[in-house]
Amino acid sequence: MTSSADYKNLESKYYMQVVNRMPPVLVRGEGTRVFDNDGNNYLDFTAGWAVLNLGHSHPAVTEAIRDQAGKILQMSNLFYTTPQLPLAKIIVDNSDIDRVFFCNSGAEANEGACKVARKWGKIKLNGAYEIITTLDSFHGRTQAMMAATGQPHYQDNWRPLMPGFVNVPYNNVQAIKDAYTEGKTCAVLLEPVQGEGGVNVPSDNYLKEVMDFCHDKNILFMLDEVQTGMGRLGTLFGYQQFPGVEPDVMTLAKALGSGAPLGAFTTKQFCSVLEPGDHGSTFGGNALTTAAGAAAAKVIVDEGIPRLATETGAYFQGKLMALAEKHSFIEEVRGMGLLIAIQMTQDIAAATVTAALPEGLLINAVRPNMVRFMPPLNVTRDEVDEAVAILDKVFANTSD
């Protein structure tokens, strides 16, 4: 058997050094657990970065991939293939959206949404092109999406940024109104809850007020549901947590493919402005990835998985709040569904992640003073208890 050290040597020799990797060489996953090359197992409270909402190796997903691999993997979108179209129907039937285009990633999905917005501005708003986004957002790592992402540490090495985006404070309706310029602004792009920005949950009326403003100005109200979609916040799509909110354009990825590389941008009929030749993708919506996506979506919808996110998320937050009573440096517990963070008074998030690893828990330092949790939505309460016990042990060794 190739040793973990051998794999790490291969990585250091051949792979671009763009990621600071954690030590385990992971070889297998099942449910909420992953297993490394040395036989250790870990609770995965990252879910492959909010991708594996049904956990690792869910039987319905693995069976769908195995079955589709023996039929057809890939054809040009010039031809009809299945199960691309049934997956599109599941999305439309369970949302306020009318049209779907499949791509390969969240960044691609957001690029597509911005193309919709730009064309809307061209044909409806006399050439308006600017898109308002928010500080602490995250929309991807392409050139355009780095300009859309309102975090300087993602942007600074790539300046000058692509024009056409303006970043304003999140959860501030007036900031969006102030940034709007008639004849220039064509859309607003927001996350229902900011994930990479620190699990920032907006006030109850924020999204609705922004939507109403967009409609008043005839600009598109676009929601990036790459991290929040497919049940993570407690409803199939995150916006459904906020009464009266309906996106004109919505993007998806991560959990959409349940581990297969699949994204989508979706529109209401009135703003479905792309025509043949306006957009395309060689691999987007191929038979293999949409087979995985359709299988996962069916389980999520039919088995009421978003409800588990609500119930287990509330249980998990309660346990974390109890930890905060014991450890005074835990300043705040916040989140929605199973997208949760703890904020601390000290910059010890990285140390917490490092200390939790040998205890058997995978978590994420989303800010220097903040740890993020995004486990599979079918995580059990016993697994939550196990994770909290590990955190308690780690925090007990942290100076208040």
Place the predicted regions along the sequence by residue.
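Conserved N-terminal phosphate-binding loop of PLP-dependent enzymes in the Aspartate aminotransferase
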Residues: M1-D400
